[in-house]
Amino acid sequence: MEIEATTVQKRRSLPTIAMHKQSRTLTKSKPKIRIIHIFAPEIIKTDVANFREIVQNLTGKQDHHHHDLPHQKGLKRNPRSRRSHDHHEVHDMNKSHGFCINSDEEEEGMVSMTWNGNGDESSGGFLNGLGDLDGFIQELGEFPYLPFTIDPAVASSSHLHGNVFAEPHHYA
């Protein structure tokens, strides 16, 4: 009984730990939850005449500098020269917006167009409907427990390594 009495007295004599005057209790913020729908790339086949319209619909950008002026409505254009002009515009768009065009079908009057986004560049408005996809992919490294499996045989051909989208590495 004496032992119990001494321990109680020791506990009472210990000073209580007080908070500093300027300290505050912090509330933990809720984690940011994002639901992002990622669609697989599609190959869109179109003729050269409709290519500009399809690209504008996909990117959400309007054509401001190619509207026909009122005094040009009566003028007829040579369709062959217009086709070569469209051909140059398609290749310029290919370089600036990350579109990949198959040249085999291009000569037949059909254009096959795919979008291959570069990791370092912005999507250029192409993925506006998907939200902040660029930021989402960059933030994947913050989640080390995503359900990705890494098989060395598959990983050498894949761009998905260690829970982050990256360039392929060779395993020794």
Curated annotation (Swiss-Prot):
Locate the region Disordered.
Answer: 60-97
Pinpoint motif VQ by residue range.
51-60
Subcellular localization, as worded in the UniProt entry: Nucleus
Q: Where is the composition biased (Basic residues)?
A: 72-85
A single Gene Ontology CC annotation of this entry is: nucleus
Q: Which UniProt keywords apply?
A: Nucleus
Extent of Basic and acidic residues compositional bias: 61-71, 86-95
The extra comment attached to this record reads: Plants over-expressing VQ17 show stunted growth phenotype.
Q: What does this protein do?
A: May function as positive regulator of plant growth.
What is the protein name for this chain?
VQ motif-containing protein 17
**Protein species of origin:** Arabidopsis thaliana
Q: Which gene encodes it?
A: VQ17
